[in-house]
């Protein structure tokens, strides 16, 4: 039976409970973090995140989220803060910590803040804190900048690489989309970073069914996101949304096959080894 990478097991730092289980909220403010930033204690945790004062906020492009998200100045750093339930915040913090231990491209988890109450004593949702990835952009901000015509294809290629790396590590995403990724320019290409692990699960090894579910969901979500861009006149007219969605599936399978297929070579078939190395380099 496949064993989980011991690096991931050592990363657990929060006892994350089942999000459907009922348990009492902490009565006092609690900041759980791998390392402390004293400035964290000066923030207005007693206020809903949507009402935090403008002088604390960093004006950075935000992707689409079903939760309240803000970029906040904390000393010399900028943190992304997401307001969610305590169980979900603790679980996502733990998963991100484990993915970081595996040296996978994700945002860096900083803290989870629980036990928040307003001045009237009413409970507020928890906040997950991650470090803002410098120079990164959500996909909508990239398309708003009138980039090259092949931008969509290059973003898809980056997402395919990210998805393969996560799957090889045993991470089932459960909500693959352009919205849950940040992109960094990497010469003429892009690098993709996981930014939302809310629905994810880290296992010793994924089944083919789990991988295919992620891929199929990614294709569906990407086509929908690109159609949304097209309706807002942000997508070049010659881009076929369905073709781009299919490209992710093709690129994923090509890369997965190149990395995981086993071949047998006889001593006089060195050219086959060269051929495989060249294929990996091309991918």
Residue map of PLM features:
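Conserved ATP-binding subdomain of kinase catalytic cores across diverse folds
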Residues: 40-153, 157-174, 221-223, 228-229
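Short, low-complexity Ser/Thr-rich regulatory SLiMs
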Residues: 116, 183-187
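Catalytic cores of secreted or luminal carbohydrate-active enzymes
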Residues: 268, 272
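Long, charge-rich C-terminal accessory regions
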Residues: 274-283
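Beta-sheet entry/capping signal
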Residues: 127, 180, 191-192
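Hydrophobic residue at the +6 position relative to the catalytic HRD Asp in the kinase catalytic loop
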Residues: 176, 181-183
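Juxta-kinase regulatory segment immediately upstream of eukaryotic protein kinase catalytic domains
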Residues: 2-58
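C-lobe/activation-segment region of protein kinase-like
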Residues: 190-261, 265
């Amino acid at each position: 039976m496949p064993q989980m990478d011991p690096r991931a097991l050592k990363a657990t730092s929060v006892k994350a409970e089942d999000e459907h289980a009922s348990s009492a909220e902490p009565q006092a403010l609690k900041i759980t973090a791998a390392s402390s930033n004293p400035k964290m204690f000066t923030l207005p945790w007693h206020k809903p995140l949507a009402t935090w004062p403008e002088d604390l906020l960093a004006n950075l492009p935000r992707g689409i989220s079903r939760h309240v998200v803000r970029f906040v100045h904390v000393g010399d750093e900028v943190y992304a803060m997401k307001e969610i339930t305590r169980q979900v915040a603790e679980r996502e913090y733990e998963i991100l910590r484990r993915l970081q231990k595996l040296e996978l491209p994700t945002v860096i988890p900083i803290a989870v803040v629980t036990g928040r109450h307003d001045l009237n004593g009413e409970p507020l949702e928890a906040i997950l804190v991650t470090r803002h990835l410098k120079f990164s952009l959500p996909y909508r901000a990239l398309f708003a900048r009138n980039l090259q015509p092949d931008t969509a294809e290059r973003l898809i290629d980056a997402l395919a690489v990210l998805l393969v790396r996560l799957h090889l590590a045993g991470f089932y995403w459960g909500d693959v989309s352009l919205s849950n990724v940040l992109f960094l320019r990497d010469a003429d290409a892009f690098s993709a970073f996981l930014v939302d692990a809310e629905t994810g699960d880290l296992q010793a090894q994924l089944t083919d069914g789990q991988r295919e579910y992620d891929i199929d969901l990614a294709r569906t979500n990407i086509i929908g996101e690109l159609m949304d861009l097209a309706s807002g006149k942000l997508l070049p007219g010659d881009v076929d949304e369905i073709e781009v969605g299919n490209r992710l599936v093709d690129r994923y399978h090509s890369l997965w096959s190149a990395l995981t297929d086993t071949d047998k070579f006889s001593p006089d078939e060195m050219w086959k080894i060269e051929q495989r190395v060249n294929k990996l380099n091309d991918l």
